[in-house]
C-alpha cells in the first residue's frame, strides 16, 4: 500500500456508498463532460465512469498513481488522466467548448485557490460538486452579519448559487484528516450583478481586513472624500456606521460600480 503524501493533502475515500453520495449531488452525470481533481488511485473516477459520462478527465499530481489510473483508462475509452499541477491547468486546455461538471474531493491545501481560479472560467462550467474542509465550506455559504461571512463568501456568491449538501466525518477518509469535511454544490448564476472587479476586490480587502470598524473608516481610502463615501453608501441602502459584514453581495457589487465613477 502506498504511503500518503501529507504535503499534497491526500485524504482518499474508498467507501462506495460515500462515493455514490458525492456523485448523486450532481444534477446529472450520464452523457456529461466531467472534470476531477486529485484522482488518487481512481476510486471516485471509477464510480463516476459507471454513470456513463460523455467523458471524464482527471488530474493527479502524484505520479505514483499513474499505474492505477492507466489501468482505469484501459477499461474506459471515455476516460483520460493527466499527471500535473491542477493550479496550472485551465479547463479550456482540456475541454473544447463543452460545458463541464466538476466533481472533486479537493486537496484542502489548494481548495480555495482552485475555486477562485474556476470563478474566472464559469462560462464553461455547468456545475461543481466539491469537497471542502467544513470551515471553508461555512465561509463560502455564509450570510451577511455572520462571523464566517467575508470576501470569499461575496466572491463566490456573486457568481454561483452555493448549497451545502452533507458533511463527512474524518473516519470516512484514508488517512483521516483532523477536520470535518463538507460537500458543496455550486451552480453558476445566469443573471449577475454588474461590478468593477478590481474595485470590488479592493473594497473586500480593505473592508474585511478591518471588519470590526465602521464602513466610514474601513472604506475611507476607496473614495476621494467622506462626502463621496456617504453618498455611495446611501445609494446602496447602507449607513456609514454599519460594518462591512452587514452589506450583502449585491450592495458591495453596486458600491464597486459607484466607486469606479467617483
Swiss-Prot record:
GO terms for molecular function: 16S rRNA (adenine(1518)-N(6)/adenine(1519)-N(6))-dimethyltransferase activity; RNA binding. It comes from the Bacteria. Its EC number is 2.1.1.182. The keyword Transmembrane helix does not apply. The gene is rsmA. This is Ribosomal RNA small subunit methyltransferase A. GO terms for cellular component: cytoplasm. PANTHER family: DIMETHYLADENOSINE TRANSFERASE (PTHR11727), DIMETHYLADENOSINE TRANSFERASE-RELATED (PTHR11727:SF7). Belongs to the class I-like SAM-binding methyltransferase superfamily. rRNA adenine N(6)-methyltransferase family. RsmA subfamily. S-adenosyl-L-methionine binds at residues 11, 13, 38, 60, 85, 105. Keywords: Cytoplasm, Methyltransferase, RNA-binding, rRNA processing, S-adenosyl-L-methionine, Transferase. SMART domains: rADc. InterPro entries: KsgA/Erm (IPR001737), rRNA_Ade_diMease-like_C (IPR023165), rRNA_Ade_Mease_Trfase_CS (IPR020596), rRNA_Ade_methylase_Trfase_N (IPR020598), rRNA_adenine_dimethylase (IPR011530), SAM-dependent_MTases_sf (IPR029063). The lineage of its organism: Bacteria, Pseudomonadati, Pseudomonadota, Alphaproteobacteria, Rickettsiales. CDD domains: AdoMet_MTases. It is found in: Cytoplasm. Specifically dimethylates two adjacent adenosines (A1518 and A1519) in the loop of a conserved hairpin near the 3'-end of 16S rRNA in the 30S particle. May play a critical role in biogenesis of 30S subunits. It is an enzyme of class 2 (transferase). It comes from Neorickettsia sennetsu (strain ATCC VR-367 / Miyayama). It catalyses: adenosine(1518)/adenosine(1519) in 16S rRNA + 4 S-adenosyl-L-methionine = N(6)-dimethyladenosine(1518)/N(6)-dimethyladenosine(1519) in 16S rRNA + 4 S-adenosyl-L-homocysteine + 4 H(+).
